[in-house]
């Protein structure tokens, strides 16, 4: 579960390393889960890349430490909280995605992120 002030790792090569959640997009929502879009600020970035420190970006959550129940009865959780930075068209700003992503992203129409990911769990 991601809420305001939560730090997340960035799982793409857009230039940002860590982001901090400012707001969970949706109607008066408090927590974000896998597949939800958040507004975040870049806290740590690599130099000479597309994203700079203190930029305001939109990102989609791809991994959470909080256990997620699936309809089949399986439970899944990841080792870290991670997100992929996206543009207004819901396409990733980077060209690569690092680490596994959850299958729920395909149901939420983030197929470009799923196709770039090395592993879908």
Swiss-Prot record:
Keyword flag Cell inner membrane: no
SMART domains for this protein: Ribosomal_L14
Keyword field: Ribonucleoprotein, Ribosomal protein, RNA-binding, rRNA-binding
InterPro entries for the chain: Ribosomal_uL14 (IPR000218), Ribosomal_uL14_bac-type (IPR005745), Ribosomal_uL14_sf (IPR036853)
CDD domains: Ribosomal_uL14
GO CC, any one term: cytosolic large ribosomal subunit
Any Gene Ontology biological process: translation
Database matches in Pfam families: Ribosomal_L14
Gene3D superfamilies: Ribosomal protein L14
GO molecular-function terms, A-Z: large ribosomal subunit rRNA binding; structural constituent of ribosome
Subunit structure: Part of the 50S ribosomal subunit. Forms a cluster with proteins L3 and L19. In the 70S ribosome, L14 and L19 interact and together make contacts with the 16S rRNA in bridges B5 and B8.
Function in brief: Binds to 23S rRNA. Forms part of two intersubunit bridges in the 70S ribosome.
Family recorded in the similarity comment: Belongs to the universal ribosomal protein uL14 family.
Protein's name according to its UniProt entry: Large ribosomal subunit protein uL14
Organism: Synechococcus sp. (strain RCC307)
């Amino acid at each position: 579960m991601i809420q305001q002030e939560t730090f997340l790792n960035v799982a793409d090569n857009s230039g940002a390393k860590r982001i901090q959640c400012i707001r969970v997009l949706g109607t008066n929502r408090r927590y974000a889960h896998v597949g939800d879009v958040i507004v975040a600020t870049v806290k740590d970035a690599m130099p000479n890349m597309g994203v700079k420190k203190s930029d305001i970006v939109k990102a989609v959550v791809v991994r959470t430490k909080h256990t997620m129940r699936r309809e089949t009865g399986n439970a899944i959780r990841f080792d870290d909280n991670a997100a992929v930075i996206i543009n207004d068209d819901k396409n990733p700003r980077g060209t690569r995605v690092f680490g596994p992503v959850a299958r729920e992203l395909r149901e939420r129409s983030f197929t470009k992120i799923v196709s770039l990911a090395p592993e879908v769990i």
